Curated annotation (Swiss-Prot):
Family annotation (Gene3D superfamilies): YcgL domain
Domain YcgL, chain residue ranges per copy: 1-84
Originating species: Photobacterium profundum (strain SS9)
Entries under PROSITE patterns matching the protein: YCGL
Entry superkingdom: Bacteria
PANTHER family, alphabetized: PROTEIN YCGL (PTHR38109:SF1)
Taxonomic placement: Bacteria, Pseudomonadati, Pseudomonadota, Gammaproteobacteria, Vibrionales
SUPFAM superfamilies in alphabetical order: YcgL-like
Name this polypeptide is given: YcgL domain-containing protein PBPRA1080
Entry-linked InterPro entries: YcgL-like_sf, YcgL_dom
Length: 92
């Protein structure tokens, strides 16, 4: 299975996977508005691949059923909150 990958012009580290290059017909208009102007990254063969931040099976399933897959960055870990929680548990 081949897919085309685009990065968002508005959201950092946000990528959109679609079945056919430059065919955004399956992507909702509201998502395209939030995503901004898509910037082409590459065409990728998904079989036998491992993706850094996405489960390749979920990507393939979403492409087959919905027509696109949106990859968003993982939530930012607040190290200050973790440190404060660790300190609080040490003093209790």
């Amino acid at each position: 299975m081949l897919c085309s990958i685009y990065k968002s012009s508005k959201k950092e580290n946000t990528y959109l996977y679609i079945n056919n290059k430059d065919d955004f017909s399956d992507v909702p208009d509201s998502l395209m508005g939030t995503f901004g102007a898509p910037q082409f990254v590459m065409v990728l063969k998904l079989e036998g691949r491992k993706l850094a931040l996405a489960d390749v099976e979920k990507v393939k399933e979403s492409l087959a059923t919905v027509g696109y897959y949106l990859q968003v960055p993982p939530p930012v870990t607040n190290l200050l909150h973790q440190y404060k929680a660790a300190k609080a548990s040490q003093t209790s």
